[in-house]
């Protein structure tokens, strides 16, 4: 099965585990779509309990749980220290030929998630690329998704 009938999807997250929380069921269900995850930081700069190496390792373990249709990259800067132009340039320079981009929603309590959401329209400006948002644990309750992928807990267990 394909996600929205797309071949290649770019998933952008602010931190390790953002995309995985919001998209893991879709990764499992839509095994005929290639998902590339770009994490724009190694983790929280005020989190003294883990390191960016720990967080990156966690992501890599999650990506391996899927049937080869998920690969990812973790950028080592903090989102708050990057301006939108440099993040857009980094993504456009290193990742291309996508049918769809997914980002965190603008209706999110975390400022770095909102910053990542702002990248979506800029990345879609040149090509006919669909933009979809995924839910995170910090997404506000009044957010309304522009797509909902139904999952059966019995069909997509890990």
Model-inferred region functions:
Residues 1-16, 20-133:
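Active-site beta-strand->loop->alpha-helix modules in alpha/beta enzyme cores, enriched
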